[in-house]
């Protein structure tokens, strides 16, 4: 069982800087736990580590997919576990860094995602529930799960429609509760470090980060994605891109689109924090207002590695 450090939290709280410091101190390699950083060409809007930063420490699961490819949580789990094994074999410490909650939960808890999810019956069930979600909303679909399997619903946020539908799919296919489905034992030993800060400070930093992304060429990057048909691809669903597509289509102004990016980013950050606090065991730190806590984090990791 490999030891793995995960660094989680919303955007603009210092995950990249901390990951570089920890990797350099403990001989680590970074695995991106972000669902959008796999796409080549989407550098600014996904806040990838820079070329210079990646030259300091090996990074994995960045720039491995074309913008027209899909990349599911099951794909991530398989790829990340492969990287963990290879990094461990090299005698290095795997560091999973990112903010895509369910991707990290699937990896940390070794969730059984099911290899049957691509058969026709499963697809039909999912299509049915997706249609209902479109017509009646995510809350209604979650309530249907709550009626059938309250224990499962208690562990799955309303916003995680894919997971809610997956639970309903398993119930309908097997006739058994999703919450009673056997889960495989943990595959690796994770220490989860969470970064956060006071909400007004976080929101200010998010707004500043969006402004910096625009200065760095976000609109040009999003326009390239739009011209490639990215509006209809998984890659085009990311915050920072989807809000700009209506601007390129001429239906909203540039300023309106940028304000929407900031709003969506703030809302997403709030959801990320809620997810990690409700779904995972995390050691929380605020490096924005208390930078000396970096030493505390290093001491925590050092002690955990010696166990």
Curated annotation (Swiss-Prot):
The keyword ATP-binding applies. Catalyzes the transfer of a dimethylallyl group onto the adenine at position 37 in tRNAs that read codons beginning with uridine, leading to the formation of N6-(dimethylallyl)adenosine (i(6)A). GO terms for biological process: tRNA modification. SUPFAM superfamilies: P-loop containing nucleoside triphosphate hydrolases (SSF52540). Monomer. ATP binds at residues 9-16. Pfam families: IPPT. Keywords: ATP-binding, Magnesium, Nucleotide-binding, Transferase, tRNA processing. It comes from Limosilactobacillus fermentum (strain NBRC 3956 / LMG 18251) (Lactobacillus fermentum). The keyword Disulfide bond does not apply. The record marks 100, 126 as: Interaction with substrate tRNA. This is tRNA dimethylallyltransferase. It catalyses: adenosine(37) in tRNA + dimethylallyl diphosphate = N(6)-dimethylallyladenosine(37) in tRNA + diphosphate. One of its GO terms (molecular function) is tRNA dimethylallyltransferase activity. Its cofactor is Mg(2+). Residues 34-37 are annotated as: Interaction with substrate tRNA. InterPro entries: Dimethylallyltransferase, IPT, P-loop_NTPase. Its EC number is 2.5.1.75. Belongs to the IPP transferase family. Signal peptide: none annotated. Substrate binds at residues 11-16.
